Amino acid sequence: MNNSEGLKSFQQSLADLPQWVSERLLQQINQLTNYEPVIGIMGKTGVGKSSLCNALFAGDISPVSDVAACTREPLRFRLQVGDRYITLMDLPGVGESGARDTEYAALYREQLPRLDLVLWLIKADDRALTVDEHFYHQVIGEVYRHKVLFVISQSDKAEPTSGGGQLSTAQKQNISRKICLLHELFQPVHPVCAVSVRLQWGLKVMAERMIKCLPREATSPVVSQLHPSFRTTVVREQARSDFGETVGAVLDSISAFPLIPAPVRAVIQAVRTTVVSVARAVWDFFF
C-alpha cells in the first residue's frame, strides 16, 4: 500500500462519521504525528550518554541550549530525521558532588513532568549507588518511577575485563548480578537493560524495551528517529498498536462529550473498531 492509498483507506473508514468528528479526529492525528517527545538521559560523568544516543538514533543532533553545568537548566539537544524531531535532555548524575545534589533534586522535580522517559545510565563497574538509591526513592518517587528505564552502560567494562571483541561468560554472569542488584535497590517498574556500545551488545533489546516504556503518543515519533537496525518488528508493531489505541482514545473522548447527540455517539462507537484497525494498517503512511 502506497501513501496515497493509505490515506484514502483511512479517510474511507471515517465516511460514516459526521464531518466535524472526522475533522477533529484528523486534527488530533496531525498533532500526534507532529508530537516532539522529550527524553532525559541521566548519568554520572563518563557513563557514556553521548555514545549511547549516537548509537541508538539516526538523526543529526544539534544543541538547542548552551548552558553551563553549574546552572539549574539542563542541556538540550534536538534530534532531526526528515521533518520529525525529538529532544534529548542531558540530566546530571547524582552522587558526584554532595553540594550539587540538592540543586539537582530541584532540577529533576521541575523537569520530570515534561519528560516522556528518563534513561538512567549506570556504569557496569559503578559500585557507589547509595546516593542514587536515595535520590530515586526520594525525588523520583512513586509519581514518576514509571518514567525511568535503568540502563547498565559500558558492560564491556564489567569484571573481569578483557578488552576483547565480545563479552566473556564471567562478564555476563556479573552483569546478571548487577541487574539483580539494581532491581533489589531501586525496585523499578521496567526491567533493567544492559548494553555495550563498543561491542554493539544489548542495544536492540534496549530499544525494544525503551519503546514499551514510552507513553503511547511518543512511541511512533521515537521509532521514526531510531537507527534503522533497531526498528525491529517488535518495535514497529508496538508503535503501530499504540497509534491505533491513541486513535481509539480520541474517538472515545469525542464520544464522551456531554452534549453529543445519542445517534452520533452510536455511530462513533459502531465504527471505532474499524477506524482503529485501519489506523494500524496505514501506520506506515503517517510514520
UniProtKB/Swiss-Prot annotation:
Signal peptide: none annotated. One of its GO terms (biological process) is tRNA methylation. GO terms for cellular component: cytoplasm; cytosol. One of its GO terms (molecular function) is GTP binding. GTP binds at residues 43-50, 90-93, 156-159. It comes from the Bacteria. Residues 48-138 form the G domain. Keywords: GTP-binding, Nucleotide-binding. To E.coli YfjP and YeeP. This is Uncharacterized protein YkfA. It comes from Escherichia coli (strain K12). The lineage of its organism: Bacteria, Pseudomonadati, Pseudomonadota, Gammaproteobacteria, Enterobacterales.
